[in-house]
Amino acid sequence: MKNINPTQTAAWQALQKHFDEMKDVTIADLFAKDGDRFSKFSATFGDQMLVDYSKNRITEETLAKLQDLAKECDLAGAIKSMFSGEKINRTENRAVLHVALRNRSNTPILVDGKDVMPEVNAVLEKMKTFSEAIISGEWKGYTGKAITDVVNIGIGGSDLGPYMVTEALRPYKNHLNMHFVSNVDGTHIAEVLKKVNPETTLFLVASKTFTTQETMTNAHSARDWFLKAAGDEKHVAKHFAALSTNAKAVGEFGIDTANMFEFWDWVGGRYSLWSAIGLSIVLSIGFDNFVELLSGAHAMDKHFSTTPAEKNLPVLLALIGIWYNNFFGAETEAILPYDQYMHRFAAYFQQGNMESNGKYVDRNGNVVDYQTGPIIWGEPGTNGQHAFYQLIHQGTKMVPCDFIAPAITHNPLSDHHQKLLSNFFAQTEALAFGKSREVVEQEYRDQGKDPATLDYVVPFKVFEGNRPTNSILLREITPFSLGALIALYEHKIFTQGVILNIFTFDQWGVELGKQLANRILPELKDGKEISSHDSSTNGLINRYKAWRG
């Protein structure tokens, strides 16, 4: 993978000139000039997904210049490097192969000359056997009762992905009740334990090293709670499984290493739901549906790795994102799913994007002088419309938005879905085209009112429009289509990281806070006043000690 400063390319300079020509062009102008704009600026993924990017401040020339940037930054070479198992995570000397976890073609993928697919398939087979025993009731707890509840204990990628997917695919779930514990705040584990019975609960401890502070603190609290009821430590093996590679620590905890599900250092945490970390997904929706999830992602992997950049959906979305982030100065992107089951999707890609591309040092080790990853946020529609859409419509900040919705709902109650989708379509239209002063005044006339007497309020009812959006319409949210959608966003993030010349697959930014927390923890054990930090940190610690007594 090459290290190219994007701002030094000819394509970047051409884009800067083009931006000067485009900055005052409106989306309304673009549609007025081209009645065929939708067909030119939309694409489908099989019969599963339609991506409409026509309501953006772009022309065919814009996209051509952005494609030139991708070529100059050798995006095609970077894609080949990732899929071939090259160690593109150079700061940790690791390959990046979440694509191998869902490689349904079983084509060999090599790391250090060794095909990883046999090991991937062996773990999948183990997940299948284990999950079938739990779901069928064949697996019994220490009193002979079948498992009814599963508690996944993890944090970051070991929590966000499985939680998001099990919620998104709730229509496919079986009888098992799923719970997720991540926060080291004791309230999280305490509230979950109130809902479950030690005789019928299975805990999944998701930590590659089996040393993650938050996860192991929660796991030990769960173990203590369980043993208060079960008594004998030998029963731990019937109620705990590990998603880890540290067999020694897993065994010492009391977990049978036969129920330890491994993954590899070429699986990044925020890309790990496809691995053993996805065991909670398998237990929730069954192995066959999990395979469908993998198959959908694999289909998008094939699209990304083989489709020319001009028609490549992750590449197109990535380039449009760079256009706003690096030329228009937009600092955020909103992800707005119009489906309640998808309520954790934005939070999942908040980590997926911000932990991946929130970097200020480039691949050469130099501090960048251009913008890197955007701030990602969002909530499901229509809730967001009654919360933050005001700022998107009439605020002073540009917020490019992705609107996501299924054409077919899993819950066809009355006309709920038509009302939901009418809002989905209306919002992108309103954001693009707005509402002029003339229209506001005409509305007053139609109501029999004189606009002149209401002049003081007219400006507040004007919508400038020209707010960019992408619309992603799925036929239906299924395991397959969700897998494809997740992979679409993963590859968008990778593409942007390649072009921005940063390392997308490390996350050193999480380390400093952890180091300092480990230093501070012993200082909180007693009541002595602290003076070892800056005055602010000392003051906070000392007030905490005074108040806790």
UniProtKB/Swiss-Prot annotation:
User: Where found, per UniProt?
Assistant: Cytoplasm
Superkingdom as given in the UniProt entry: Bacteria
The answer, when asked if Secreted is one of the entry's keywords, is no
Which SUPFAM superfamilies has this protein been placed in? SIS domain
> Residues where N6-acetyllysine occurs?
80, 228, 234
Q: Pathway listed for it?
A: Carbohydrate biosynthesis; gluconeogenesis; Carbohydrate degradation; glycolysis; D-glyceraldehyde 3-phosphate and glycerone phosphate from D-glucose: step 2/4
**Which CDD domains would you find in this protein's record?**
SIS_PGI_1, SIS_PGI_2
Q: Where is the signal peptide?
A: none
Its principal location? cytoplasm
What this protein catalyses is: alpha-D-glucose 6-phosphate = beta-D-fructose 6-phosphate
Q: Which keywords, in A-to-Z order, does the entry hold?
A: Acetylation, Cytoplasm, Gluconeogenesis, Glycolysis, Isomerase
Q: Does the keyword Cytoplasm apply?
A: yes
Annotated active site residues, numbered on this chain, are 355, 386, 514
Q: Which family does it belong to?
A: Belongs to the GPI family.
What is the name of the protein in this document?
Answer: Glucose-6-phosphate isomerase
Protein species of origin: Escherichia coli (strain SE11)
- Taxonomic classification: Bacteria, Pseudomonadati, Pseudomonadota, Gammaproteobacteria, Enterobacterales
Gene expressing this chain:
pgi
